Amino acid sequence: MAKGKNATRRGERELAFQVLYGLSFTPARSLEELRRSFRMSPDNLARSEESGVPVEACGFSWELVEGVWSNSSALDETISRFSHNWRVDRMGRVELTLLRLAAYELVFRADVPPKVAINEALELSRQFGEGNAKNFINGILDAVAKALENGELQRCAAPSNTSI
């Protein structure tokens, strides 16, 4: 994969994280509210303004946002299964958002290698998380990846995404 695509995907993941983190404070109750939150995200608007690229061109980040939002219950069940002694409702918003994002990529996105999904989550945790957050996140995501690898957990097909 070209370095440019990696850098672009990293930026798309960061944007998806920021939108999803914002939604942890003000949840979207419908797909239309989700679209509005995505379009109106300050980071999305600033990025679109700076680059001249319309918000609609942020396809990968939208796929991640919609995928995590649409599958949050299943993702929380997966995270709970591998977060021994930690309930999802007791996790910090940053950590939970990063776990959901990476778990979505692990379970629903066959096009993303597990090591990439985990590494990207760890990079974002270094940027946005606190203290030992990366160790906590790494432990859970590594367990999810191993469960997928040995068949204890099944990979799901990503639902067809709707457009922004």
Curated annotation (Swiss-Prot):
The keyword tRNA-binding is assigned to this record: no
GO biological process per UniProt: DNA-templated transcription termination; transcription antitermination
One GO term describing the cellular component: cytosol
UniProt-listed InterPro entries: NusB-like_sf, NusB_fam, NusB_RsmB_TIM44
UniProt xrefs under Pfam families: NusB (PF01029)
The keyword Transcription belongs to this UniProt entry's keyword annotation: yes
NCBIfam families: nusB (TIGR01951)
Top-level taxonomic group: Bacteria
Any one Gene Ontology molecular-function term assigned to this protein's record: RNA binding
Family: Belongs to the NusB family.
Keywords from the named record: RNA-binding, Transcription, Transcription antitermination, Transcription regulation
Biological function: Involved in transcription antitermination. Required for transcription of ribosomal RNA (rRNA) genes. Binds specifically to the boxA antiterminator sequence of the ribosomal RNA (rrn) operons.
Identification of the protein by name: Transcription antitermination protein NusB
SUPFAM superfamilies given in the database record: NusB-like (SSF48013)
PANTHER family attached to this UniProt entry: ANTITERMINATION NUSB DOMAIN-CONTAINING PROTEIN (PTHR11078:SF3), N UTILIZATION SUBSTANCE PROTEIN B-RELATED (PTHR11078)
